[in-house]
Amino acid sequence: MTGSNDRLITRRRYLQTTALASAGLTLGSFRGFGRNTVAKPLTREMGRLHFAATTLGLGGQASLQWTPADVDPTRIILKAFALGINYFDTSNMYGPSQANYGKAFRELHLIPGEAGYDEKLRRSMFLTSKTGLRWAKGGWQKPGLGNFTNGKQGSKTIDDIKRSLSLMFGDGQGDYPRGAYLDMVLLHSLTAMAEVDAVYEGLGKADPKAENIGALAALVDYRDGSNLTGLNPKGEKLLRHIGFSGHHSPAVNMEMIQRDDHNVLDAMLVAINANDRLHFNMQYNVIPVAAARNMGLIAMKTFADGAMYTKPSRWTMNPNDVVRTVGSASLASGPLVQYTLTTPGIHTVIIGTGQIDDDAAACQLQRNLAAAQIAPAGLSVSDRRAIEKLTAPVKDGKTNYFQLPAQALTAPREAAAEQKMRDGKRVVRVTWQTAYAGDEPLVRYEVWRDRQKIGSVAHKPQVSKAPFAFEEAVSDQAAHSYSVTAVDAVGRTAASGDLQIQPA
């Protein structure tokens, strides 16, 4: 006899199948859709991190941060290890999340210096924490900056790093054992250009006497064991890689990468889900830039922090906001995971877990892991568009409360034209910074003189502040007017203003 739970699962599967079919999809479009167990998780090499991460990583929020009374967050972490997941995320802004990792790490014998320390297991995992503190020295009162921590008021960047190590490997009161380290520290949630200015302060020109030193210069010291900032007198090496996270502004994220003349940034954690193209999107703007720099690319917000389902479109505020079901009758979770993981450039996705269960079909961790068993090109463009069609009506398309609203294709930025004499010839050089893509990718830039197109330059991800450029030799001595037009994949255009060149 079929039980009520079986009837519920069957009805849910029927409704999901109907929803997929209405969008032009079938269950067969998605590898692992109906599978709940994974023998050996797929991995992807994470660019210059030189680590093969499982395609699903454990997010540090959901029940690890906002823990319901009947949930033991330690069991979630231990189950992730048991399932073979090897990428783990947390932050100094996630309340008890780091302490919960600490409890699990003790059970797993991951505490350096303690009897039975499992160094092999520690080397096989990748542990990332984050700091929202933009300054390593001074700067606390500067306006226009998000500067935040769950640590002590007035803390600086390195205080957060030591806090992470103490909570996860030490006594939780500030001490941590020799040999404890973080695989990576991310500058958490950059949202404004002023924050980019702050974190870069002093990088490459560190002066221990400086009044203000940004986060990056100090993190480099604690990565390399150097003391260029004067903030690492013991020459400690507490972290191995440095990166940043951003879910608000692709422009800010791009600026962060383009300023990195010292190749400090090894990874980016970025929001990317099926409603991305309804906003100032990441997939056609910053993600290609990070990929071109060979950065490790970690995705987040696959379910829009639960807003794809039962949670309102706002930041999580308490345990009641935590989503504890697997998808919904009308919106399966698997395709959303696979959308994220088939976004070109993405290596892994971190997803917070609200609920685990002995029944694999009801276990968020197992279902998400099964869905994550997909190759980078595992969905076609039409499959991805069909998934977007499913998620667009959710919350009237406003699930991504953390992301800037949609904007159309922009004109090339900072366009300029100058002339000079070279080998007796008059040469005009036109330069510009990348345009921002709308809901379709950029393809090329067209250069115009006196309302006539004279050439084009293929778009490519702009990985530094060095501008795009076009030159031509001009045979006359007259005045001319130049402009640059951005063109996207569907032929839409956006032109710069006129750039006047005076008579030679």
Give the residues covered by each predicted segment.
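Extracellular fibronectin type III
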Residues: 489-504
